[in-house]
UniProtKB/Swiss-Prot annotation:
Heme binds at H122, Y126. The keyword Zinc does not apply. Residues 29-173 are periplasmic. GO terms for cellular component: plasma membrane. One of its GO terms (molecular function) is metal ion binding. This is Cytochrome c-type biogenesis protein CcmE. Its main location: membrane. Residues 134-173 are annotated as: Disordered. It is a single-pass type II membrane protein. Heme chaperone required for the biogenesis of c-type cytochromes. Transiently binds heme delivered by CcmC and transfers the heme to apo-cytochromes in a process facilitated by CcmF and CcmH. Keywords: Cell inner membrane, Cell membrane, Cytochrome c-type biogenesis, Heme, Iron, Membrane, Metal-binding, Signal-anchor, Transmembrane, Transmembrane helix. It holds the Pfam family CcmE. InterPro entries: CcmE (IPR004329), CcmE-like_sf (IPR036127), NA-bd_OB-fold (IPR012340).
């Protein structure tokens, strides 16, 4: 073999090993990729039953029904469409009607989303980007987490005194 043919064989072998490694990585990742959908996308696209995805939106007011053995039924809405959800387990402490959530699970034949994980928003300004985009597209987005700015505490509100200041005032005799 000539030097040139050995180099070509080595390059081809390295290319084959890299292609195999890339194929293994992609096949391993395909099982862990879970897509996010809003209720409007679920209604419009007709998601196939058994497809695993994340459903994000707001818990519809008046929809939470607690059953025996930690069974909970509620509806998730993006104000354009609503998807019924069934979940069994402990809900996050921040879960309540009107709050943003992301649930992971599958859609059954009847159109009910069977969640195995429910995540609630964790501060008053957080909302999943996809949910916020869907609300903005519908013209229903409110800046500041939907709270009335006039009810917010003024920035120069009195702050509680520190222990040092209080002790300093008392020690003067």
């Amino acid at each position: 073999m000539t030097r040139k043919s050995r180099r070509l064989i080595l390059i081809a072998a390295c290319g084959a090993v890299l292609a195999l490694a890339l194929g293994l990585i992609l096949s391993a990742m395909s099982g862990s990729i879970v897509f996010f959908r809003s209720p409007a996308e679920v209604a419009a696209q007709g998601v196939a039953p058994g497809t695993r995805f994340r459903l994000g939106g707001l818990v519809k007011d008046g929809s939470v029904k607690r059953g025996p053995d930690q069974n909970v039924e509620f509806a998730v809405t993006d104000t354009n469409a609503t998807v019924p959800v069934q979940y069994r387990g402990l809900l996050p402490d921040l879960f309540r009607e009107g709050q943003g959530i992301v649930a992971e699970g599958t859609l059954d034949v009847g159109g009910v989303f069977r969640a195995d994980t429910v995540l609630a928003k964790h501060d008053e300004n957080y909302m999943p980007r996809e949910v916020a985009d869907a609300l903005k597209a519908q013209g229903r987005w409110q800046e500041g987490g939907g709270k009335d700015a006039s009810k917010a505490a003024p920035k120069d509100a009195a702050k509680p005194e520190t222990a040092d200041a209080t002790l300093g005032q008392r020690s003067e005799r």
